[in-house]
């Protein structure tokens, strides 16, 4: 992106902020230096809280990194997957706890392209086939489909898990109040309608019967509402979880 294009984009964003009645903060540009007095070089990406942050704001590098880490985790547990005495449902629960937690870490904030989603689903399917055994086939002697594998292991699809994580995180931010910085950013993403992440979140809200950010705030005050919408059932005898 050229310098003129960057200035034009900043001017457009500043105008949008003023139109919303928000205060525009002018940040003075400073020269960052390293400890030894030399000018620090800009990096293309860096790790923050276990996630790879890309200079362009793309989720692609982090998704590829997550796929690699999940595969490594799966291989470390190969002795567990090879145990014949373990029921498939139990293996599925272990797979969800150890592999899905690595594969989908921080996925609630990803902006996923169709190609990246195919990569996630494809790797998940590959690992599940390794888990149940490549020779396992259905009654027609055909290779098991993804839906059949998910049913055998008692797992949800990758698309459903990412959607659930995103909605749960957004609900948590909404319950923290209007002054929460994360919630302010979410509202901006949804109302501007310029980001794919915000557009997809708005579509998820519509599927749940929510038409606005205010409506979402009112709905998620009742934690049981979102749990029921996501197909979860509260276990009796357990107290409510705190945010």
Predicted segments, located by residue:
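Short linear motifs embedded in intrinsically disordered, charge-biased segments
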Residues: 1-243
């Amino acid at each position: 992106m050229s310098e003129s294009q960057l200035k034009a984009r900043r001017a457009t964003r500043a105008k949008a902020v003023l139109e919303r009645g928000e205060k525009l903060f002018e940040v003075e540009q400073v020269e960052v230096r390293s400890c030894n007095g030399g000018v620090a070089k800009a990096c293309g990406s860096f790790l923050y809280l276990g996630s790879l942050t890309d200079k362009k704001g793309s989720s692609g590098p982090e998704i590829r990194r997550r796929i690699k880490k999940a595969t490594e985790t799966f291989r470390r547990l190969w002795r567990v997957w090879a145990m014949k005495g373990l029921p498939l449902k139990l293996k599925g629960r272990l797979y969800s706890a150890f592999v899905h937690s690595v594969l989908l870490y921080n996925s609630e904030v990803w902006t996923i392209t169709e190609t990246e989603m195919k990569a996630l689903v494809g790797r998940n399917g590959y690992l599940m086939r390794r888990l149940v055994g490549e020779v396992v086939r259905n009654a027609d002697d055909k290779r098991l489909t993804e839906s059949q594998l998910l049913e055998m292991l008692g797992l949800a699809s990758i698309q459903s898990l990412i959607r659930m994580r995103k909605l749960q995180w957004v609900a948590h931010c909404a319950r923290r109040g209007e002054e929460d910085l994360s919630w302010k950013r979410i509202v901006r993403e949804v109302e501007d309608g310029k980001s794919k992440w915000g557009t997809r979140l708005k579509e998820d809200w519509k599927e749940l019967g929510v038409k606005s950010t205010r409506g979402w705030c009112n709905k998620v005050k009742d934690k049981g509402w979102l749990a029921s919408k996501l197909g979860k059932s509260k276990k009796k005898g357990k107290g409510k979880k705190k945010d």
